[in-house]
């Protein structure tokens, strides 16, 4: 029995074409053109308490370099042009620390999209975290870290940073 598979062109302005679907590094650059302005980054919302890690305060980022079928973060990933507002690292840190203090959290993060978009913004945010009592959980799919060794090494200098790499699956159960 032969199963015919229709080849789908996944390319659009937010998803550069690639022979096997899309190129996550090209998609990183495309996403950054939408969600980064200088040292400012787009967020859908700031500082919400979550139960993960025994309690964490998280900001919801906009933009990603993957297009996972089972992703729960639909609008911030698929419609970054019309989602969120731009915030400076100081604004994000202030909102996170205020909410974290209210809930007694020592962990803060920015999640629900790709955490490594906007390196300047990320590094400035991590410098603020390093001078604080908090630990920042960087949630990433790891594509940019694997592609750019210097970026990964630069992250290693931050003492209050925990990097969590999320390995994606090929079906809903694995994801």
Locate each region found by the language model.
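Conserved active-site and cofactor/substrate-binding residues in soluble primary-metabolism enzymes
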Residues: 59, 87, 120
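Conserved AdoMet/S-adenosylmethionine-binding subsite of the radical SAM
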Residues: 93-107, 111-175
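N-terminal [4Fe-4S]-dependent radical SAM core
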Residues: 2-65, 69, 73-80
């Amino acid at each position: 029995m032969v199963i015919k598979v229709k080849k789908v062109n996944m390319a659009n302005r937010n998803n550069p074409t690639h022979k096997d679907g899309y190129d996550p590094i090209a998609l990183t650059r495309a996403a950054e053109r939408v969600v980064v302005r200088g040292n400012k980054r787009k967020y859908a919302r700031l500082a919400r308490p979550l139960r993960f890690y025994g309690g964490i305060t998280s900001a919801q980022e906009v933009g990603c370099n993957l297009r996972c079928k089972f992703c729960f973060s639909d609008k911030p990933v698929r419609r970054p042009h019309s989602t969120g507002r731009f915030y400076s690292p100081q604004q994000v840190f202030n909102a996170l620390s205020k909410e974290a203090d209210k809930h007694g959290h020592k962990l803060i993060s920015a999640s629900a999209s790709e955490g490594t978009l906007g390196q300047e913004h990320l590094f400035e945010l991590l410098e603020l975290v390093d001078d604080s009592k908090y630990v920042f959980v960087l949630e990433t799919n790891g594509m940019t870290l694997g592609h750019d060794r210097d970026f990964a090494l630069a992250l290693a200098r931050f003492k209050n940073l925990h990097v969590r790499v999320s390995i994606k699956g090929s079906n809903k159960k694995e994801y």
